[in-house]
């Protein structure tokens, strides 16, 4: 089995072969830190976290770098609105990012470079572009000469003659008169009144958006990397411009593989802050009461390259699915001791191979999840037999292997059982009273084994039963 990934650059699935055997360099375009992350961000970072986890599971050494854009017009506007500094805004939402990602069980990157911490590298790269004739200074600004780079458009498939002027970057009207060509984009912007600025060979100013990532990739990972990832909305102009800047200087491919995740849609439109149709991660988790694992499952149940529709019905389906998976993930904790699981076991090789076959096919997480659900449903069936009939339908050690397989493979997807207390809170009073009634009926029928099984089952969920005179049973949560 060999991992194949869809490469946006070649527009086909390709066998993954890293530059250095056994090691993977991976760069992800991070957030512009001026607001809380929304569901679109969650999708992107869950997808790339899953890619990273899978590469680690395959045995690769992975160096994962993800930047923060902390110099940007949006941050400046927010700082003016709130009467504070750009750094204060950036620091606040950088911290919020870490909090949100931790809740979604996203592994921390190996390095989080910031634009403000990479200014020397940014200026060196601009100077090299200027020396090689790919950049020119104009009244304190510096622009990249798009027509000088012969391969411009190779990632997005766009041709200059089909583009509108200014399409290659974030443009201010004052810039147009300084450009040699309308398609050129800013590498360095001259200082403006009441805006942060840094000294440079071209005068005080700040970097353009695209040059930041090119410099951070080069500084942290080198001239060429294995995989560059981001949202599909970054293919053009951001990633196209990254390629132009980096390859104009080095003469080497910036990345072997370019991977892009699809957008989250609301009512047929991309979820974005500019459209005002976004829902933040915090709103979903805190106000909506959605479990982080349900949100993760929502992302993984769809092909990562395709758009995904955000609806209440889709979330509810994922909620139901997560309840099934979580019941399976908790099976060993509830029943392992009673089933005599003492020896360690390895994962089921056939099921593991099916999981890997799915993931090797361009991260086919829907097919990989099908393996997990097959295991979880079997564990749930066996649990029902244990509760209601007091026996298993099959071999206890094989069931142990299936549970271990489920836990490990779910972990590759970042899906981990939540604490028992979360599950206990979902068992409402009516359900508890129903179990007590079933236990009472079992005792009346002198089926004390069944009565004990129900007591143990509820105890595993944090429910203690207290039998009192007159056949009354009270309960409490522990």
Curated annotation (Swiss-Prot):
Q: Write down the required cofactor(s).
A: Zn(2+)
The note on the cofactor says: Binds 1 zinc ion per subunit.
Alphabetically sorted, this entry's keywords are: Aminoacyl-tRNA synthetase, ATP-binding, Cytoplasm, Ligase, Metal-binding, Nucleotide-binding, Protein biosynthesis, Zinc
Q: Does the keyword ATP-binding apply?
A: yes
> In chain numbering, where does the motif 'KMSKS' region fall?
270-274
Q: Which residues bind Zn(2+)?
A: 29, 213, 238, 242
Q: What InterPro entries would the database entry show?
A: Cys-tRNA-ligase (IPR015803), Cys-tRNA-synt_Ia_DALR (IPR015273), Cys-tRNA/MSH_ligase (IPR024909), Rossmann-like_a/b/a_fold (IPR014729), tRNA-synt_1_cat_dom (IPR032678), tRNAsynth_Ia_anticodon-bd (IPR009080)
Keyword hit for ATP-binding: yes
* GO annotation (BP), single: cysteinyl-tRNA aminoacylation
Where can this protein be found?
A: Cytoplasm
Q: Name one GO cellular component term.
A: cytosol
GO MF annotations for this entry? ATP binding; cysteine-tRNA ligase activity; zinc ion binding
- The short sequence motif called 'HIGH' region sits at 31-41
EC number of this enzyme: 6.1.1.16
- Record family assignment: Belongs to the class-I aminoacyl-tRNA synthetase family.
Query: Subunit structure, briefly?
Result: Monomer.
In Swiss-Prot or TrEMBL terms, this protein is called Cysteine--tRNA ligase
Q: Which organism is it from?
A: Synechococcus elongatus (strain ATCC 33912 / PCC 7942 / FACHB-805) (Anacystis nidulans R2)
